[in-house]
Amino acid sequence: MSDPTRPARIDERSRNVTEGVMRAPNRSMYYAMGYRETDFSKPMVGVASAHSTITPCNSGLQPLADTVVAALKEAGANPQLFGTPTVSDGIGMGTEGMKYSLVSREVIADSIETCVNGLWQDGVVVIGGCDKNMPGGMMALVRTNVPGIYVYGGTIKPGHYQGRDLNIISVFEAVGEFTAGRLDPVDFKEIEKRACPGSGSCGGMYTANTMSAAFEALGMSLPYSSTMANEDAEKLASAAESARVLVEAIKRGLRPRDIVTREAIENAVSVIMATGGSTNAVLHFLAIAHAAEVPWTIDDFECIRRRVPVIVDMKPSGHYLATDLHQAGGIPQVMKLLLEAGLLHGECVTITGRTIAEVLENVPAAPRADQGVIRTLSDPLYAEGHLAILRGNLSPEGCVAKISGLKNPAITGPARVFDSEDDAMGAIMARRIVEGDVVVIRYEGPKGGPGMREMLAPTSALVGQGLGESVGLITDGRFSGGTWGMVVGHVSPEAFVGGPIALVRDGDSVTIDAHRQLVQLNVGDEELARRAADWTPPSPRYTRGVLAKFAKLTSSASKGAVTDLDL
């Protein structure tokens, strides 16, 4: 670990472009932006902002960026604001545009790394909102390993209609209800208009809120910051404090890899399990661990699942939203319960310089009695975690199932096979999928999609049609954090590389059994061998541009779908 007592130069990196006779031209560029000679002894701190009017998840980030810039100046640093791209999962969902979502994780990580290292910045504040902003930013922080902190843009507040709280998943499920004749046109339109009342990331324990909670547990974001609403004043105050904390970290030489250790990742994943977080966290923490050079495998999630119960009652399968969790005590309250039970590593250091145990010292040992969001460990929603790693002849490298909230976590039924999400969605909307079917959506993996689209539209349509627990769905693609039901994703190896999912035929018997951690194609080995011999790899869907590059470089989902695994 970096020595927190060392008298380090706080411009240790930036002096490469500001110090000495040979750097006069470099300094001249800074003078053009209003720098003074005395500024060159201050740390240059990047502010990587994903502000955008593309999506409500990011449309409220500019005030946070402005606040961070001002606070950095007050703390004696030179803020250097730059932008990172974002892709809206909610807007791209169900279209070809969704293929760019996971790709954007890599683009975000690459863009931040490029600016931080290209400009010799001494530290960086990453400000993000939508789903892939989260892992992309954290991957960049641990790659560059300069002092850094993550500032989450904050959650959206709930919408309201007829006495019911709404969020974006309400609209996706309303599509299924409407097509099934269970929702009239007026109510359908009102839900569409009222679900998202302002700025902030999708409000349940979906992917963005899952990752923000995990970053708080990881020690890379400030306490309580992950559940604050974007539009509330406390979010601005937290952003300013984040800037001040980062400057102190620069002075101490405290770096991301001092914080993001194997034990810290175990803490983060424990919180993901306890809060009922998104399946995407499996993919993203494989990628973050890879970037941090921390040994971590898909089986490590399973080890933690077996010892950590679900104690937070959050949507999509539960009842509450992130704003409710914040009012109930936020992630520190959840972490305190886990720490008291011996389920967290209290010695892990955080960006504040304090340990997890020190940060949680004054948090109550028990949740308040006047709230229903956070349970005790003696009265959990589920005795074990909800993200199960399944294996079988259909997915020998492993796949991910979200098993919370299911009355019967096992199904055996006939396969209904589709070679794209679009074909599957057409069949669902035409009511051709019936109770007992197992929908198989393939050629949607990291290479085959490419980009591993999220299957939120088909899963939500099934839920809306009343088939969420009576129809299984298996895919080499991903799921949104808002997905629930009998669903299995990240099937590896994927169809595009000849994985067993490519061999499934319509009508084959398929079993999903979460209790046995099994995903099985009930076809004999000899028949599967014949099918494998007859299988031919498909042509790439893209041969130019960023999707083609991603398809060429990406690893298996079981390794995090990273693009620099074998370089």
From Swiss-Prot:
Under the heading SUPFAM superfamilies, the entry gives: IlvD/EDD N-terminal domain-like, LeuD/IlvD-like
Please give the Pfam families that the UniProt record associates with this protein. Answer: ILV_EDD_C (PF24877), ILVD_EDD_N (PF00920)
Catalytic residues per the record? S480 (proton acceptor)
Show the catalytic activity. Answer: (2R)-2,3-dihydroxy-3-methylbutanoate = 3-methyl-2-oxobutanoate + H2O; (2R,3R)-2,3-dihydroxy-3-methylpentanoate = (S)-3-methyl-2-oxopentanoate + H2O
Pathway membership, UniProt: Amino-acid biosynthesis; L-isoleucine biosynthesis; L-isoleucine from 2-oxobutanoate: step 3/4; Amino-acid biosynthesis; L-valine biosynthesis; L-valine from pyruvate: step 3/4
What InterPro entries has UniProt attached to this entry?
A: DHAD_IlvD/Edd, Dihydro-acid_dehy_C, DihydroxyA_deHydtase, DiOHA_6PGluconate_deHydtase_CS, ILV_EDD_C, ILV_EDD_N, IlvD/EDD_N
What sections of the protein cross the membrane?
A: none
Chain residues that bind Mg(2+): D89, D131, K132, E454
Q: Does the keyword Lyase apply?
A: yes
Q: Does the keyword Cytoplasm apply?
A: no
Q: Which residues bind [2Fe-2S] cluster?
A: C57, C130, C202
Which top EC class is given? lyase
Its domain of life reads Bacteria
What does the record give as cofactor? Answer: [2Fe-2S] cluster; Mg(2+)
N6-carboxylysine-modified residues are K132
The record's comment on cofactor binding reads: Binds 1 [2Fe-2S] cluster per subunit. This cluster acts as a Lewis acid cofactor.
Q: What keywords sit in the KW lines?
A: 2Fe-2S, Amino-acid biosynthesis, Branched-chain amino acid biosynthesis, Iron, Iron-sulfur, Lyase, Magnesium, Metal-binding
* GO MF, one example: 2 iron, 2 sulfur cluster binding
Q: Summarize the subunit comment.
A: Homodimer.
Instruction: Name the protein family.
Output: Belongs to the IlvD/Edd family.
Cite the HAMAP family for this sequence: IlvD (MF_00012)
Protein task: Functions in the biosynthesis of branched-chain amino acids. Catalyzes the dehydration of (2R,3R)-2,3-dihydroxy-3-methylpentanoate (2,3-dihydroxy-3-methylvalerate) into 2-oxo-3-methylpentanoate (2-oxo-3-methylvalerate) and of (2R)-2,3-dihydroxy-3-methylbutanoate (2,3-dihydroxyisovalerate) into 2-oxo-3-methylbutanoate (2-oxoisovalerate), the penultimate precursor to L-isoleucine and L-valine, respectively.
Q: What is this protein called?
A: Dihydroxy-acid dehydratase 3
Q: Which organism is it from?
A: Aromatoleum aromaticum (strain DSM 19018 / LMG 30748 / EbN1) (Azoarcus sp. (strain EbN1))
